[in-house]
């Protein structure tokens, strides 16, 4: 998949160094619920074990070809937010040097198009932990509406319990937002 500034493609073993460059930053992973990576080998294991699954994409800069983040659609069986075949959960992160440039909303919009048009989803869910205002803003910019907040969400990779927020965007809402221009294509 492509956008104006990005290519979204499957993760490859050769992406481990790029992944490590951003995943080692304590400002990136922990706020999303996963610990900073300790070395390139851990990043390679993550590519092979976590990021190498269907509907998980490396976000690459068209200008440099380098990986700058990750985005995924977690389908039935790999998400706690739905048990339906026509619903999925969106997950994403982007390296700190790329924060504030509008790249993540750009990637999310393309993945939403893919979810609704190519995969036939009727609803996409997304969550964020309290304090992750950047993730909240990405969801708002892309048309997601908050559905509920849970005071105690288990964050197993961090061995913590946090407050979590869950948002949703239906296919009808997405289409309406595109039609009236409230969310850019």
Task: Give each language-model segment a name.
Residues 1-31, 56-185:
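Acyl-donor (CoA/ACP) binding surface of acyl/acetyltransferases
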Residues 13-14, 47-49:
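Short linear motifs in intrinsically disordered
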Residues 27-48:
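Conserved GNAT-fold acetyl-CoA-binding loop/helix
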């Amino acid at each position: 998949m492509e956008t104006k500034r990005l290519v979204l493609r499957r993760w490859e073993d050769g992406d481990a160094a790029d992944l490590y460059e951003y995943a080692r930053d304590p400002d990136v992973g922990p706020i999303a619920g996963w610990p900073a990576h300790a070395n390139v080998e851990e990043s390679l294991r993550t590519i092979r074990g976590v990021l190498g699954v269907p509907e998980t994409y490396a976000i690459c800069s068209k200008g440099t070809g380098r990986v700058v983040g990750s985005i995924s659609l977690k389908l039935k069986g790999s998400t706690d937010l739905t048990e339906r075949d026509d619903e999925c959960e969106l997950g994403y992160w982007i390296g700190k040097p790329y924060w504030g440039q509008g790249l993540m909303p750009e990637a999310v919009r393309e993945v939403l198009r893919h979810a609704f048009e190519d995969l036939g989803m009727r609803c996409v869910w997304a969550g964020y932990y309290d304090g992750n205002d950047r993730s909240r803003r990405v969801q708002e910019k892309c048309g997601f509406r908050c559905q509920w907040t849970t005071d105690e969400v288990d964050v197993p990779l961090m061995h913590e319990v946090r407050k979590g927020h869950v948002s949703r965007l239906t296919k009808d809402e997405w289409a309406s937002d595109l039609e009236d221009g409230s969310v850019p294509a």
